[in-house]
Every structure is written in C-alpha cells, then in structure tokens.
Design a protein with these regions (language model features):
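Structured alpha-helical subdomains that flank or immediately precede key functional sites
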Residues: 2-134, 139-448
Length: 448
C-alpha cells in the first residue's frame, strides 16, 4: 500500500495531542518496502553466521572433495530424482500445461468459505469499484468506506454512487512530488548512492499509500463525488505517467542539489569574513532552494493536470445533483472540503488508527517509518503493533456497529478473485512443491 521508506524513526515530537507517541513508542520497519529491507538484512546475517568459519569450511571441502559448483554429474543425479515419485510426475504433467494457482486450488477451501454472514453493514453499494491498472487500492478502500456514509446521509437512490478516487490520487501525486523534493533538499549533502537516498529515489512516486496518508489528504483537500472529477485514462492506467513524472522529478532533484551547492559556495566568502553567521547562511540557502522548488512544482502540477485533468480546488464550489430513494431530484452546492465535513455521516478522518501485527516486536507499541509519507509536515504514518486476535476483535466490533472496515494485506498470495475467497489453505503448494505456508512470526524466528 504504499510509498517510500527507509530507516525507521519515532514519530516527531511536534505531533498533536492525538498524534503524540507515548513512552512506549519504538521504531520499526513496518511499511512493506522497509520490511523487505529488514528481511534482506536478516537473511544476510543468517548467511554470515553460517559462513563465519570460511577457512574451516574450505578445509572440510578439501577433505570431502565436494565440488562447490554445479557439475554435470550432479545434473544426472538431480534429473533422475526430480520425477522419482508419482506425485512429482503428476504435478509436472498438470502444472506445465496450466496456471499453478488454477491447478492447485483446493475445492474444500472454497466450499468452506461461503458468503453467508451473521452480521453485515446495513448499507451496501451495488457496484464494485475497479482501480484497473493502478496501485490505488488504499484510495478505493477509503472512498468505499465514505461513500456508504454519503449514500445513507443524502438518501441517494443510485447505489452505484462513488466518490472520486482520482481526485485524491491527483493531490496525492502532487504532494508526493513535493515530499520527494523536500527530502532531496534535506539529504542534499549525501551522495546519490547513500542507502537511504538511493532507496527513496526508487520509490517516491508509487501509487500506494497508508491510512494516515489518505486521511491527511482528506483533511487537507476533502472529497468529491466521482461525477465532479471522473476517471481519466491515465488515472486508471498510471504506468506511463508515473515513469514520466519520475524522470522529471529526478531531474528536478539534481537541480536542487546543484543549486544548494552553488549557493553555499557563493555565501562562503561572507561567512568566512564574519558578515553572516552560519545559521543565516543556512537559512539563505534553504530559502533560495525552496524558492526554486516552488517554480518546479508549477511544472509538476501542469504535467499532472495534462494527464488527469484539472481537479477542483479544496475550497472551490461545485454543484452535485442526485435522486433520493423516492425518486425526487435533489441538489446542493458545496466545496470538496465542506463535502467531507458535512456529508460523510459518521466518518471522521482522524477518528481511527492503524493496527498492525509485527512479530519482531512486542505488542502495544506505537511505531512509524522514517520518511514515509505524502504531505510534508503532516501527521506521520503511525501504527499500533498488536496481536492478530485483537485485530480480529476490532473488525468484528466495527461490523456489528454497522461500519465497514479498511484493511490491508498481501491479497495476491492466497486469494481467488472469481469466488472472492481469501484463505491460506486455498492453494496446495506443499503437495506439488513441498513448500509449507508458515505464520510470519515463524518465518522471522527462522531468520534469527
């Protein structure tokens, strides 16, 4: 779901009363991209521990005369062993002709997951939204929550009603561009191959995001019905515009780094002569660089507007019309900001927090990720680390209270779109490949 990440840090001390971390705050790589870095490091440590006695291993190898490379003799042995069992031959016959997931789907797992529930949210939208070829799942999930409240409050007859995902997407891209350039300014003294800066440069313009990122957008920009700012081709197919924007923003980043260096050099004489203090020099450099960044952001906005169309401004008035449940025409004039304040029912952008389960750390800790975000100086992305059991309890409580639930998971692993089933028992990888599906805490423990 998300954006960019590097080393984790605690939330900033400038957070509001509702945002301020407790003394239990820890730092952690919770975001999926940062988590990937942690796994790489853990695997490296694991390998290092196995290979620490390299010389001893070499001696043992010489004694046993075991070749370190793939030998042709080994190929003969492996080839004979590959299909030595009947199950291996059956798997090969089946899987080389069809999709692995289609072939290994377990019928009993599908049958045990019937879409009949003891509780459900009272208001449901008839139309299933479609993010198409984009990574905007987090925006769709959030607007799906809110649209149910709008349908209920405005008594909208059309159950296909949607809020504009592309409206939030436009401003997310605008903010992420600024967020990237501000990070570049802050890290301008580091080389491009610095691990943190290098990672940020490869992930800053992704479509993904987190709960706190979308609520930050909603608080600042509001929401609009999809009829006010509908989908464009590029909002539904983001690959090309993402590439173009990434190329342009990297060029802008280099401009800012060069400008900072030149400005510092120009003011160094005044600093050496004592005419200005170091603090004054640094402030002048920052003002100069940020002024240039503001000019760059004009180009960013222009490129986004060309690709997506110009969106309403947060306080720009629009008119929305609909039919109520009795078929009567209704209309109102409002702004995106006021729409999210007045017509979104019980939804409150900052009334919820993200619960996560990270088995590497103990429960009941507030965690964040360094440089993960979209709006500069907004509330940081925060998570409460807890147990799967508590997460499930809160989901049940929300549904019983009539509220749909925003959640994020790796849906590509054990889900089947046609039946809508998500189950770790859905695909029998173990019978075909000998791969066991283990809980994350077991996998993490195995890397220690």
């Amino acid at each position: 779901m998300g954006a960019s990440a590097s080393r984790p840090v605690a939330p900033t001390a400038s957070a509001t009363a509702n945002e301020k971390p407790s003394s239990a705050t820890i730092t952690n790589n919770t975001h999926h991209s940062a988590d990937r870095l942690a796994r790489i490091q853990a695997e490296a440590n694991h390998r290092a521990s196995r290979w620490s006695d390299a010389e001893g291993s070499k001696n043992k190898q010489r004694q046993n005369n075991v070749a370190p490379d793939v030998t042709l003799a080994s190929l003969d042995e492996w080839n004979a062993d590959a299909f030595s069992q009947l199950t291996h031959r059956l798997a090969a016959t089946t899987l080389h002709n069809a999709s692995i997931n289609e072939s290994l789907r377990v019928r009993d797992a599908e049958l045990s997951n019937q879409h009949i529930f003891s509780h459900s949210v009272p208001t449901e939208a008839a139309h299933v939204t479609n993010q198409k070829s984009s990574g905007r799942c987090w925006l769709f999930a959030t607007t799906n929550l809110i649209r149910l409240e709008v349908i209920k409050q405005l008594d909208i007859k059309d159950k296909d009603f949607e809020l504009s995902q592309s409206y939030l997407h436009f401003y997310d891209k605008l903010e992420k561009s600024n967020f990237w350039l501000e990070n570049v300014i802050e890290l301008a003294d580091r080389p491009w191959d610095d691990r943190e800066l290098n990672y940020l440069s490869g992930s800053f313009f992704s479509d993904g995001g987190q709960w706190d990122e979308v609520t930050n957008l909603i608080v600042k920009y509001g929401v609009v019905p999809q009829s006010i700012y509908p989908e464009s081709f590029n909002s539904s197919n983001t690959g090309k515009i993402n590439w173009l924007m990434t190329v342009k923003l990297r060029e802008m980043a280099q401009e800012l780094r060069d400008l900072k260096s030149v400005t510092e050099e120009r003011l160094q004489v005044s600093l050496d002569q004592g005419r200005i203090s170091r603090a004054d020099r640094d402030a002048a450099v920052l003002d100069t660089v940020r002024a240039h960044k503001q000019e760059q952001m004009k180009d960013v906005y222009r490129m986004l507007a060309i690709a997506y169309g110009r969106p309403p401004k947060p306080h720009e008035e629009f008119e929305f019309s609909w039919y109520d449940s009795k078929g009567k025409y209704q209309s109102l004039k409002t702004t995106p900001y006021d729409f999210q304040v007045k017509y979104t029912g019980t939804f409150t952008a900052k009334g919820s927090c993200s619960l996560v389960h990270d088995p590497r750390n103990e429960s009941n800790k507030l965690i964040t990720v360094s440089r993960l975000g979209n709006i500069w100086n907004a509330q940081p992305v925060l998570y409460v680390n807890t147990t799967p059991e508590l997460m499930m309890d809160k989901v049940v409580e929300s549904i019983k209270a009539g509220h749909a639930v925003f959640f994020g998971c790796d849906v590509g692993q054990f889900s089947y779109t046609a039946s809508g089933v998500m189950d770790t028992k859905l695909y029998d990888y173990e019978s075909a490949f000998g791969i066991k599906v283990r809980r994350r805490e077991v996998r993490v423990e195995g890397l220690k």
